[in-house]
Amino acid sequence: MAKLTDLVGYQDGAVVSREIINQKSGSVTLFAFDEGQGLSEHMAPFDALVYLLDGEAEITISGKPLHLKQGEMVIMPANQPHSLKATKRFKMVLTMIKA
């Protein structure tokens, strides 16, 4: 048993990730973003669910910015450009199903 927020820690000026599950059928990865850090626009071939464990983030999907807070989630559709930025430090779990 584990608390997800305890499995990945913040680092100043960095994005930290920890893969929890990596199978042919999908993956679960934890991320910790320091304030101001992010991931530049990219696409993925599969739908991905993002759930914020802590903090606040701006997630832009196909040019539309969304502001998420702790406890909120969004689905990033396959083959749609998206980016993430920490408006405050935040932790998230990214679940990608590859089926």
Q: Language-model segments: what does each one mean?
A:
Residues 27, 56-58, 65, 81, ...:
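Structural motif
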Residues 32-34, 45-59:
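Short, conserved beta-strand element in jelly-roll/cupin
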